[in-house]
Every structure is written in C-alpha cells, then in structure tokens.
UniProtKB/Swiss-Prot annotation:
Family statement: Belongs to the protein kinase superfamily. Tyr protein kinase family. SRC subfamily.
Annotated catalysed reactions: L-tyrosyl-[protein] + ATP = O-phospho-L-tyrosyl-[protein] + ADP + H(+)
Name of the protein in its database record: Tyrosine-protein kinase Yes
Chain segments annotated as transmembrane: none
GO BP terms in the entry: cell differentiation; cell surface receptor protein tyrosine kinase signaling pathway
Listed GO MF terms: ATP binding; non-membrane spanning protein tyrosine kinase activity; signaling receptor binding
Domain called SH3: residue spans: 85-146
Entry annotation: catalytic residues: D390 (proton acceptor)
Binding of ATP, residues: L277, G278, Q279, G280, C281, F282, G283, E284, V285, K299
Length: 537
C-alpha cells in the first residue's frame, strides 16, 4: 500500500485451459521393494480404502508442530482429551521468551500441564519443572510422547515447502522430515534430500501408509508398530530408499498467533519506533519494539488516510487470514494516527530486494520459486473469498532463505484519499491494475490475477517499473486497445505465456491462483525441463 513513482508488441493470442495437476503418485519415490527382507511387524494385508485419521492430523485447526511452513487455520480447534483438568502433558517444541508479565518463558523440551485451552492461540499452562503458571503460545507445544512432539515431524506441510526446507544450504544428503500426505487422508510422506549426477541436489518423497491394525509401512514387506520405529529403521539402513536417513531437517521457529494473549488493540505507548525503513504517500514503515521485548514491523498511517472504524472492522477480518505466505497481522493502534503491527521480515520488500539487495543476482529457478510462493499465498486468499487489491513487488516481503510473504492485503479498499479513490494520478498503481478495476472500480480476485502477471515482470526484470517509458494515462489507453508488454529479455516464452493468460481482457478467462501455483511449482519438471542457467537468468 502506497504511492507509485513512475514516469512493447502484442504476443500471440493463446487460449487458457485448465490443465490437470500432475498425478500425485508421480511425486513419490519408487516403492523400495527390491532390498532384502528387513525386521518389522507382521500384519494383515493393507486395506487402502480404510485410512484412519490420527487424532492430531488432517485438517485440525491447531498446527503445533511448527516447521517453516505450517499453515494455521483461522479457527483453531482444541486438542481432544480433558485438557481443562491439566491431565494431558505437553512438551515445548521451541524456546520462548516471555513478552509480558502474564507469559511463561520456557525452553525446548520443557513439559507443561495445560490448565485452560479454550482461548485457542494462547493457553494457560503450568510448568512441571518450575511450578510457574502463565500463558504459552499453543503452536509452540505438542502432546508429550506423541508424533507431533518428534523433531522430524513437520505436520501439515506441502511437497514444495518440504523441498524448499530440505534444499536450504547446509543440509546434507539424507536430511529428512515426515509430514502429512497431501494426497492421501491419514497417510504421511517421508521427504529426503538426495543427490545424483543427473539432477544434482534433489528431494525424494515416499508415502508412508497406515495399516488397519495401526502399523506403518513404505513397502508392505517392512512394517512397523509406530512411525518412530519406521524412522529408526531407515536411519540405520537405506533398505531400498534413495539414501539412509541421517539428519533431521532444521525447522524454523513459527510466528506466534498475535503478540500475546489479549494483545490486539494495543496502546501507542507500548510501541517504540526504532529504525525508519521507508516512506510512502500514506505513511511510514518502521522496525519497532513492542512492550520492550518483541521486534516488530510498524506501519504508521497519516491521519485521514482511512476511517478508524472501517479500518478496525477490516483488521478483524485480516487477522483471521492465516497462512505461512501471508505476513501475520499482530496488533493495531486503532486511533489516529493508525499503527499496524506485523511480523518483521529481515530482507524488506521484494522490490527493494530485487533492485538493491542480493535479489539482483538471482537466477530463474529462484525467481520462479518466489513467484510460486506468492501464488500459494494468493491461492489461499482466493479460497477465503478475499481480495488483495494492491498486489505488486512493493507489497511482498522477503525473509531468510528467500521466503516470500504477502503484505497489505485488503488495505487499499479503505484509503480515503480523493486522488487515490478516483483511480488516477501518481498515488494510484495504474500499471499494476486490471483495466476493469482501473476504469470501473471492479476489483475481484481476477483483477488480482492481472496484477500477479505484472508482478511476474517485476521479478524477471529485477524490479524494473512495468511498461518502461510509458506514463499512467498512456498505459491505460494502450492496454484498452489490446497492448500487452512483450516478453522480458531472457525470459522463457512459456513464462510470458502465463503472463498473457493473467492479462486476458475478460476476467473470467484468466487462470485461478490455484492453477498458477501448480504451474509454477512444477515449472522445471513439466514446462521447462531442459532449462540451463545463463549469464542473466
């Protein structure tokens, strides 16, 4: 959200079609049945039509087992079992430093009795070690002695996010994790970092199925009483897998849901503005500190930018949008000047990262992966029937390991500035806006798709302003006449074809974000398998 500072021939017409996603089975390694018989338990032949759900798996709203890519449901569901009586023991998955006098500090491995879990995001707990009572973030703990408490269990994580984590620099061959299967209810996936001369570093995925009697197996000849025993076995022998399990994949400590219990509308005095990061037409962005304890990003809005009542109403919706590719909204100061408090992303905006940071050295695979992450977040916004309205590189934030998160979703609708609401002048992002939205104010998820196509040009051209050499009015006129930006220099034509799909005149002919995400995640296997890095891309 902010103002825009700004001062090529038609491609061939192609028809958009929804192509089927790749066969999920093709994502998994071959069934490793060729090795010798290995120890395990015997059980009846598996019934593939009867996969019972684990009590903490599936679509359970609370995802306490972390990992860099746990997706949090907007409506957390309490764990089953009599937690209010404090009979279920939970264990800490990460260290946590108290932010308020009501919080408990704790270390990874510390055990708790849960006193009250009705609040969802923050539970009242008693430390078994110290006897102290206070609030703890519910996504930092898991039931003791459960699969969720295992370091190698990453819960609800997609194939692509598993690959991103495992392929991070520093991980060796054999680094692994276990996650819920995306395609088979009640099953799991074992993801292992591998290496071969043809593909170099890559990740193999093996489906772990569940037996009717409660056992687990990758291949029917080696069955195990528990996932723990399965992992132990394959840590000792590859036994048909691509490589022996060597090291648990390092996880990233997840963001808490909110700053603390009941810390939503916060007093301005609880925030300290430390370092100014940027300034726009409608306000400033700062690194700040909340309550003297917690580093945050703070967006300060100029008085009159938006009505406080309307903002607070929209913010209530925004804080319920929870996805690992969306910047979480932590808290607000709802009186003017409005402050918006969010997660601090260390690499700043994608636009600055591409132009002035290490982003200018990125090759096509990294750029396409960043685009896939953004499409992942937008596919969630699409599923939630929400609209961003201002999707561009300036509103994407970058963290460590090229993690991308979408910021400022929904805020553009609330801006009261006359020049902005008239959709003309320097403050309105004409070059990113679909013609039906710019001309008639028809903002939909399909106008966001148009904007995503423009964002793709920013990625490939390393932050170059769209429609170079053209002013806003000229862009609007030319686009209405059918002009579309040509293929950026050294950009594969297949990626330009995706851009042109996003720029279809009829919004209904533009692809869904679900399709775009799938296309980009499988880009180098399905669309450009022969890609070789060049001097630029």
């Amino acid at each position: 959200m902010g103002c825009i500072k700004s001062k090529e021939d038609k491609g061939p017409s192609i028809k958009y079609r929804t192509e089927p996603k790749p066969d999920p089975g093709s994502q998994y390694g071959a069934d490793p049945t060729q090795a010798t018989q290995s120890p395990g338990i015997k059980g009846p032949a598996p019934n593939f039509n009867s996969h019972s759900m684990t009590p903490f798996g599936g679509s359970s709203g609370i995802t306490p087992f972390g990992g860099a890519s746990s997706i949090f449901s907007p409506t957390p569901v309490p764990y089953p079992g009599g937690l209010t009586g404090g009979v279920t023991v939970f264990v800490a998955l990460y260290d946590y430093e108290a932010r308020t006098t009501e919080d408990l500090s704790f270390r990874k491995g510390e055990r708790f009795q849960i006193i009250n879990n009705t609040e969802g995001d923050w539970w009242e707990a008693r430390s078994i070690a110290t006897g102290k009572t206070g609030y703890i973030p519910s996504n930092y703990v898991a039931p003791a002695d459960s699969i969720q408490a295992e370091e190698w269990y990453f819960g609800k994580m997609g194939r692509k996010d598993a690959e991103r984590l495992l392929l991070n620099p520093g991980n060796q061959r054999g680094t692994f994790l276990v996650r819920e299967s995306e395609t088979t209810k009640g099953a799991y996936s074992l993801s292992i970092r591998d290496w071969d001369e043809v593909r170099g570093d890559n990740v193999k995925h093996y489906k772990i199925r569940k037996l009717d009697n409660g056992g687990y197996y990758i291949t029917t000849r080696a069955q195990f009483e528990s996932l723990q025993k399965l992992v132990k076995h394959y840590s000792e022998h590859a036994d048909g897998l691509c490589y022996r399990l060597t090291t648990v994949c390092p996880s990233v400590k997840p963001q808490t849901q909110g700053l603390a219990k009941d810390a939503w509308e916060i007093p301005r005095e609880s925030l300290r503005l430390d370092v100014k990061l940027g300034q726009g037409c409608f306000g400033e962005v700062w690194i700040g500190t909340w309550n003297g304890t917690t580093k945050v990003a703070i967006k300060t809005l100029k008085p009159g930018t938006m009505m406080p009542e309307a903002f607070l109403q929209e913010a209530q919706i925004m804080k319920k949008l929870r996805h690992d590719k969306l910047v979480p909204l932590y808290a607000v100061v709802s009186e003017e000047p409005i402050y918006i408090v969010t997660e601090y992303m260390i690499k700043g905006s994608l636009l600055d990262f591409l132009k002035e940071g290490n982003g200018k050295y990125l090759k096509l695979p990294q750029l396409v992966d960043m685009a896939a992450q953004i499409a992942d977040g937008m596919a969630y916004i699409e599923r939630m029937n929400y609209i961003h309205r201002d999707l561009r590189a300036a509103n994407i934030l970058v963290g460590d390991n090229l993690v991308c998160k979408i910021a400022d979703f929904g805020l553009a609708r609330l801006i009261e500035d006359n020049e902005y609401t008239a959709r003309q002048g320097a403050k309105f992002p004409i070059k990113w806006t679909a013609p039906e939205a710019a001309l008639y104010g028809r903002f939909t998820i399909k106008s966001d798709v148009w904007s995503f196509g423009i964002l793709l040009t920013e990625l490939v051209a390393k932050g170059r302003v769209p429609y170079p050499g053209m002013v806003n009015r000229e862009v609007l006129e030319q686009v209405e006449r059918g002009y579309r930006m040509p293929c950026p220099q050294r950009c594969p034509e297949s990626l330009h074809e995706l851009m042109k799909l996003c720029w279809k005149k009829d919004p209904d002919e533009r692809p869904t974000f679900e399709y775009i995400q799938s296309f980009l995640e499988d880009y180098f296997t399905a669309t450009e398998p022969q890609y070789q890095p060049g001097d630029n891309l």
